[in-house]
Amino acid sequence: PTLILKSNETLKIFLKINLKETLLKSEDFLGLKINWDNYGHFGKINKQDFFLLNKHTKYRKQKDIKSNIVNQKLEVFPIKTSLLGAFDEPVETVINYCRDIVKEDDILVIGESPLAIMQGRYENYLNIEYDIFSKFLCYFFHPTSSLATASGMQILINKLGFTRIIISLIFGFIFKFIGIKGIFYRLTNPESSLIDDISGTIMPYDKTIVLGPYNPKLFCKKLSKALKIDVAVADVNDLGGVKILASSNKSIIKLLKIALKKNPAGNADEKTPIVIVRRKA
């Protein structure tokens, strides 16, 4: 069908898909790829989206979980899941995976990118319409930065506006000249530091740009209430960097920075987006 949408208007599409029973039995998840055309004053642009339909037939049990010793007082349990997608309600999904595993006084941590993916906060790089400004501004960043590509920079411009980006860059240059680094990211946080460019995420999301999660504080509050334990959302890398985006209890942040320093969830294709931190008796 062809539809006319006004600026900033939302279109909801309901699909009914008939699948063979043999296919459902043999696969743990299915991919739904949608191709569509965007037509307007700019001409025609071919776009595509990808969604994961997950069956979640293999929830983990306590006996399946392997412990990693952090020190004499802490151990961590990476929780392996199926591939997560935008059709997985975040709180309900994590509860299903962890309710038979967590114990009293445990702390549950989920990565910021898996949470953002379940919230549908990712975009195919082919759908991003970048302009001359984003192509120019991305050259001011380190080649490995997610803002060092026109698409990554355009995402940030779309979120914060061109004016704020320019002002932040100017102040960043001024302060860097006198020996103070990181001002740009301070002025554009949290959006700028949470963008993961393509190849920064597990397949099939390695061709998408993942934004930071929406309202992680509320997610922590809901999940903490349901499981009766503390919950946190973290951004962790293999270099020992640990950033706690949100938590149900601020007093656990110092402990989490110790427990997560070696990145027990991993940054490759481990499929362990959830980590249980447990205090040893």
Language-model features, listed with the residues they occupy:
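N-terminal and secondary-structure boundary signal
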Residues: 1-281
